[in-house]
């Protein structure tokens, strides 16, 4: 019975740490770029777009498709950086515990 009590206490501690990490990660900002840094997007830890910077030389009304592709590439770059930062924080919190592929925690 004592082991069950310890297990419950550990689960509560882990839940508390998860809540702290979620709050920290939500405030984190990452910037992705494309076009040699001429286009940048900034996301927060919830993948919400916070900022877009476009070098004026990229704006060509006759070739909007290039600008669209650069925005998409910059967004995907920022998203990958956010995911990597979250994975790193998760590894710190779980002590390097290898979670199964596709296992997602509630955030």
Swiss-Prot record:
Protein's recorded name: Nucleoid-associated protein amb4104
UniProt cross-references to SUPFAM superfamilies, sorted A to Z: YbaB-like
Cellular component per GO, a single term: bacterial nucleoid
Main location as per UniProt: cytoplasm
InterPro entries in UniProt: YbaB-like_sf, YbaB/EbfC
Subunit comment: Homodimer.
Family: Belongs to the YbaB/EbfC family.
Superkingdom of origin organism: Bacteria
Coiled coil: none
UniProt keyword annotations, A-Z: Cytoplasm, DNA-binding
Function noted in UniProt: Binds to DNA and alters its conformation. May be involved in regulation of gene expression, nucleoid organization and DNA protection.
Localization of this protein: Cytoplasm, Nucleoid
Recorded GO MF terms: DNA binding
PANTHER family listed in its UniProt record: NUCLEOID-ASSOCIATED PROTEIN YBAB
